[in-house]
Amino acid sequence: MAARVSDWYFMNGTSVEKAAEQIQEIRALAAAHGRDPHEIRFGLNGFVICRDAEEEAHATLREIIANADHEAVEGFASQVKHAGQATAEKQGMWAESTFEDLVQYNDGFKTRLIGTPEHIATRIAAYEAVGVDLVLCGFLHYTDDLTDFGRRVIPLVRDLPSQRPAPTEAGEALSA
């Protein structure tokens, strides 16, 4: 349906490689439906843990997981995996999600926006390079962490050269 009628396609958190696969699949389906595949924009869920050192960020991640409400996460896992049985492939989008992935309910940890400002900016640029237009970020301490993200990460992202392939007249990305 997204390929036929949607302006935006939002993905759960995932690796750069899997995001690229989803984007390519949706664009191919859009073209098969007679749409310009570049009319569809792509959003990605991500959970940000920005710290001065990688180990500090990963310690925060371990703390979040250790303090998770296990009953709630297991209940969510059971429900979404059961719901996945109703999909065409009989799995659903959370089939490969671990307990740790589901602590941040839309697989936000899978984006790996966890580390130093430089690491996070580089990850965001990698997602942009495969066609992600927007990263929907979650934060542990929303006000403080969002402010920190805006001050320390966004300027780095803006300073990085865009890696997004330019569309051609036919709407296809230029290949190297």
What are these regions (language model features)?
Residues 13-18, 134-150:
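Glycine-rich, proline-tolerant flexible connector loops at the mouths of alpha/beta enzymes
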Residues 4-5, 130:
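Structural motif
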Residues 7-11, 40-47, 135-138:
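Hydrophobic faces of well-ordered beta-strands that scaffold small-molecule active sites
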Residues 14-129, 158-176:
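An alpha-helical appendage that flanks or caps ligand/catalytic pockets
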